């Protein structure tokens, strides 16, 4: 049973199966399927243990010819592992065996930056989940942050994303309303911030009615300075939402709320549980249920066009626009008449905090600006 997302590297797909407990690869044309590694059987009593881990449900990470992943169970202490194996199936090694107090059942993949791996797990010293880091050789395991639950979130089931020295993620529960959070954390463990706490609503889990959504199970994606994600429940019909917010926690927006179901069917889907994919100006995602037959949907959401913002800073005119839509160029003209000629701005934008920025002196010739694609 393949559970986690696939990793694409060159013309090869890599993945894991949680029933059968394997790491596999195949070519993107479907040929050359190979089981790279099979995890050993567990033995009891609970928590069941083995030498290498069990139930890998993660998306793998790769560096050169080395794969990295997690198992949600098994290992020497029965609480899951971090492992590595070469892309040809040799060199398997358990990098870390979780003991519960330092993490339990890591279900998602790892983020690799240099020679450091970052991930999330349940458990931890406070029992509400943890963000951890370790070196790619297995040394230096560190709990960067342990969730407490009520204030900061609980159960970070989804994986992390990395931008610069900042990690972003979601917590399925906890927060002031117990409906989950979006958080940020520096890679050295400092600067934890709850970017958003999903608001309280009416009803009881999982049938909570709230405009924002509740219980974000999937991870985030980042485009420019905007984070996009899904909430598994909540919304106007308690069937989940798609949301966006800025990386500083401002500007939370519900992009879509999934409609009510009758016998688990509806027109757009219910319970989005996976991360989104952004291509151009369109988000794509899946739902666990709903749709015409109740078996889930694949959906898309067209994002609103990016806006050009103009501000005055001392003697300069500062123009900014998001970086999340490729191919946009800044153009200007000296008049808006029918004979207006728009020319591409000669000054290239500088990217600052996920925004394209162009600065012009106010003393320059009066011009009108627009974005063109």
Predicted regions, residues:
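Extracellular beta-propeller repeat domains
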Residues: 1-316
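Short, composition-biased motifs enriched in small/polar/acidic residues
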Residues: 303-373
């Amino acid at each position: 049973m393949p559970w986690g997302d696939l990793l694409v590297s060159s013309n090869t797909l890599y993945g894991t199966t949680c029933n059968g407990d394997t790491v596999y690869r195949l070519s993107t044309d479907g040929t050359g399927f190979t089981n790279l590694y099979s995890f050993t059987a567990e033995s009891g009593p609970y928590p069941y243990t083995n030498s290498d881990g069990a139930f890998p449900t993660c998306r793998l990470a790769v560096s050169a010819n080395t794969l990295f992943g997690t198992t949600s169970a098994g290992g020497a202490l029965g609480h899951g592992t971090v492992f590595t194996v070469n892309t040809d199936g040799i060199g398997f090694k358990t990098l870390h065996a979780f003991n519960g107090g330092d993490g339990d059942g890591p279900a998602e993949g790892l983020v690799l930056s240099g020679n450091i791996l970052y991930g999330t797990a349940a458990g931890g010293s406070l029992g509400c989940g943890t963000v951890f880091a370790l070196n790619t050789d297995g040394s230096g395991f560190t709990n960067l942050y342990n969730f407490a639950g009520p204030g900061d979130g609980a159960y970070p089931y989804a994986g992390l994303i990395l931008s610069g020295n900042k990690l972003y993620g979601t917590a399925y529960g906890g927060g002031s309303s117990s409906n989950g959070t979006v958080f940020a954390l520096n890679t050295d463990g400092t600067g934890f911030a709850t970017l958003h706490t999903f608001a309280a609503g009416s009803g009881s889990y999982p049938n909570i009615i709230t405009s924002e959504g509740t219980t974000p199970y999937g991870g985030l994606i980042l485009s420019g300075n905007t984070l996009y994600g899904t909430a598994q429940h909540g919304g106007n019909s308690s069937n989940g939402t798609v949301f966006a917010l800025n990386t500083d926690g401002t500007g939370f927006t519900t992009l879509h709320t999934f409609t009510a179901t009758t016998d688990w069917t509806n027109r757009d889907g219910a319970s989005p549980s996976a991360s989104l994919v952004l291509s151009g100006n369109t988000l794509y995602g899946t739902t666990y249920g709903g749709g015409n037959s109740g078996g889930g949907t694949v959906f898309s959401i067209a994002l609103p066009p990016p806006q050009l913002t103009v501000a005055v800073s001392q003697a300069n005119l500062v123009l900014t626009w998001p970086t999340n839509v490729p191919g946009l160029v800044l153009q200007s003209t000296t008049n808006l008449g029918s004979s207006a000629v728009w020319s591409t701005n000669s000054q290239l934008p500088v990217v600052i905090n996920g925004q394209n920025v162009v600065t012009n002196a106010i003393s320059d010739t009066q011009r009108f600006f627009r974005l063109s694609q």
